[in-house]
């Protein structure tokens, strides 16, 4: 081991920093470039502030929004026979009276 100058801060010791500058490349060599690159690129850990995603509140006047109005559809009609349902209720009522 080479003797280290005690007056130097630990982060300024020779060999403590890589010879090349960190870059934005995510290749394997650049991910293992230094401890900072490894945590940021290799592990994906970032301790900075999270950026807020900006939302557009109002659409421009000329643009068409995605929520088009639904065309009006006629109300669905009941498929059963209304007269038949009235007769069946009368038959049930007459049967219950006869049973009593």
From Swiss-Prot:
Asked if the record carries the keyword Secreted, the reply is yes
Top-level taxon of origin: Viruses
Residue ranges, annotated region (Interaction with the host capping enzyme RNGTT): 49-87
What positions are modified (N6-acetyllysine)?
28, 50-51
User: A cellular component term (GO) from this record?
Assistant: host cell nucleolus
Cite the record's Basic residues compositional bias ranges.
48-58
According to the record, the residues making up region (Core) are 38-48
* Cross-link type Glycyl lysine isopeptide (Lys-Gly) (interchain with G-Cter in ubiquitin), residue numbers: 72
Q: Which InterPro entries match?
A: IV_Tat, Tat_dom_sf
Asked if the keyword rRNA-binding belongs to this entry, the reply reads: no
Task: List every position bearing Asymmetric dimethylarginine.
Answer: 52
Q: Where is the composition biased (Basic and acidic residues)?
A: 80-100
**Where are the membrane-spanning stretches?**
none
**Self-association or partners: how does it assemble?**
Interacts with host CCNT1. Associates with the P-TEFb complex composed at least of Tat, P-TEFb (CDK9 and CCNT1), TAR RNA, RNA Pol II. Recruits the HATs CREBBP, TAF1/TFIID, EP300, PCAF and GCN5L2. Interacts with host KAT5/Tip60; this interaction targets the latter to degradation. Interacts with the host deacetylase SIRT1. Interacts with host capping enzyme RNGTT; this interaction stimulates RNGTT. Binds to host KDR, and to the host integrins ITGAV/ITGB3 and ITGA5/ITGB1. Interacts with host KPNB1/importin beta-1 without previous binding to KPNA1/importin alpha-1. Interacts with EIF2AK2.
What family does the database annotate?
Belongs to the lentiviruses Tat family.
Q: What is known of its domains?
A: The cell attachment site mediates the interaction with ITGAV/ITGB3 and ITGA5/ITGB1 integrins, leading to vascular cell migration and invasion. This interaction also provides endothelial cells with the adhesion signal they require to grow in response to mitogens.
Q: What is this protein called?
A: Protein Tat
